[in-house]
Regions:
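Short, charged/polar surface micro-motifs in flexible loops or helix N-caps
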Residues: 17-20, 29-32, 48-49, 83-86, ...
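Residues that scaffold the ATP/ADP-binding catalytic core of kinase and kinase-like folds
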Residues: 34, 50, 137
Length: 152
């Protein structure tokens, strides 16, 4: 079953301030515009057989945020299933200014059945959250990655 599922990979950037914080992106596009809880995600995306999951995670981080992932050692947080995909995520300690993010874009027909393509940002904002706050914001299928990060 897993072999037939789409695969996605991403990087959960974290930093230590007065507490452990993680960087999440609010999903872009009209479906997510007015949603908050469950509308934030690890920067991630799909990949094929032509790259490793780690390569895909680094590529997707840069595509979604417009900045390369900070230098450092990726620590695998394992896999989780969500939205018909198997998601592999790595933790990376580093810092990033959310104001420096220039997200990539995607196109979709909007309004529906209009025949018109419109461009939307992959993520419409990026923010640091405490793990507790992030747990309430993140897509539920990705919550295990927060739990695994704090268990380390």
């Amino acid at each position: 079953m897993l072999d037939s599922m789409k695969r996605s990979a991403g990087i959960l950037l974290f930093r230590r301030t007065t507490q452990l914080e993680v960087l999440l992106g609010h999903m872009g596009g009209p479906f997510w515009a007015r949603k908050d809880a469950g509308a934030w995600s690890v920067p991630k995306g799909e990949y094929g057989d032509d790259e490793t999951p780690e390569q895909a995670a680094r590529r997707e981080f840069e595509e979604e945020l417009g900045l390369p992932a900070p230098e450092g050692e990726l620590v695998e947080l394992g896999e989780a299933k969500g939205s018909g995909k198997v998601i592999t995520v790595w933790a990376l300690e580093g810092d990033l200014d959310p104001g420096a993010v220039t997200p990539g874009t995607f196109e979709m027909e909007w309004p529906p059945k209009s025949g018109k393509l419109k461009s939307f940002p992959e993520v419409d904002r990026v923010q640091w959250f405490s793990v507790e706050e992030a747990s309430a914001k993140i897509v539920s299928a990705q919550r295990p990655f927060l739990e695994r990060l704090t268990a380390r």
